[in-house]
């Protein structure tokens, strides 16, 4: 939406680097990979990765490209946290930082909601099973997380006291 030809981050004018998150599931080595020592999935034995670790890997990539200084570092949500960490670790590496929809630290409420999601995942019977995914727990965790993404107005529209596209009260959601 914001990145591309003639958009806010215009790829006709700027070279955009968008790397996968270290330890993520889309092209990076992570918990779904097999541990070469045990030939089993890493799963919960995979090393903990922090925002700082991710940013250090990103800086390594920038250095590998031979880029001396970036015009800007931009990101939203967890990407915004990476922007803040990058600017903190490498204050002279970019001319500007554009953190979007993030904060430097979580509130107690955010930490509690994240723990709710973790507990939902760990309560799933598939949590500890090898070669399976706790899909039901992940679904509940996503529902809890979704609440944190909505504005007050968005929450009211989605969960307000009026019936949502229904003519009468029911005990089911169908």
Labelled PLM ranges:
Residues 1-81, 88, 92-104, 109-113:
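Gly/Pro-rich cap/lid or specificity-loop segments adjacent to the active site
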Residues 110-174:
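Alpha/beta-hydrolase
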Residues 60, 85, 89, 143-146, ...:
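Alpha-helical scaffold segments in carbohydrate-active enzymes
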